[in-house]
Regions:
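Short acidic/histidine- and often glycine-rich active-site loop of Leloir-type glycosyltransferases
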Residues: 157-167, 171-172
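Short glycine/serine-rich donor-binding loops of glycosyltransferases
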Residues: 139-142, 160
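Short hydrophobic beta-strand element within catalytic cores of glycosyltransferases
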Residues: 151-154
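Short alpha-helical donor nucleotide-sugar binding micro-motif in glycosyltransferases
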Residues: 113, 121-126
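Aromatic "clamp/platform" in nucleotide-sugar-dependent glycosyltransferases that forms part
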Residues: 134
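Conserved donor-binding/catalytic core segment of Leloir-type glycosyltransferases
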Residues: 30-49, 55-60, 70-73
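A short, active-site helix/loop in glycosyltransferases that binds the activated sugar's phosphate group
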Residues: 1-14, 19-25, 90
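Nucleotide-activated donor-binding/catalytic signature segment of Leloir-type glycosyltransferases, i.e.
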Residues: 84-113
């Protein structure tokens, strides 16, 4: 009502998520072609994105599935190159320490920055996509996983409840 008072000719136009082009093209996720017990997390850059939560949960998963691997998009925090170690700060150092503390070096890969095609391939290769964020609006990565048919688990935050139906199109 208030906006209409300011501009009575205002019209609201709904527009679905617009994703990167390659996500609309074949192929789509296939259980027979994915890498068994592989988890993909598309963002590990800040605490709000929750990579640490996945690391903390991984030892529990490893009890049942000891060959589980988690691939994180984002800085290669496990790099042993001196130039990389010197530039790690705050959260990246925390992730590095957490991986070592929980003895997850063989089960965790930080892939660095990925191109659109590399991201798509990670979604296709993963057995499951996990979005552990504490805050989101309308996450494109969740939509990208959905359009490819990748099974997904998401935290319940922000706009995720509008994009995901628990038990049907993914899990909270």
């Amino acid at each position: 009502d208030h906006v209409m008072t300011v501009n009575p000719r205002l019209r609201y136009h709904f527009m679905n998520e617009t994703l990167r082009d390659s996500f609309y093209e074949a192929p789509v996720w296939n259980l027979g072609q994915c890498k068994k017990h592989t988890i993909f997390v598309s963002n590990s850059g800040s605490p709000l994105k929750g990579a640490h939560q996945v690391l903390k949960a991984l030892p529990i998963i490893l009890r049942q599935y000891p060959d589980t691997v988690v691939n994180f998009c984002g800085s290669s925090v496990m790099s042993s190159a001196v130039k990389d170690i010197l530039r790690f700060q705050g959260y990246h150092l925390y992730l590095r320490r957490l991986v070592k503390k929980l003895c997850l070096q063989d089960n965790v890969h930080f892939l660095g920055s990925l191109s659109e095609k590399q991201m798509k391939q990670q979604f296709l290769d993963a057995n499951v996509y996990v979005m552990p964020s504490s805050i989101e609006n309308s996450p494109n990565s969740l939509c990208e996983a959905q359009i490819l048919g990748t099974p997904l688990v998401s935290s319940y935050c922000g706009g995720t409840s509008k994009l995901l139906t628990d038990g049907e199109t993914g899990y909270f």
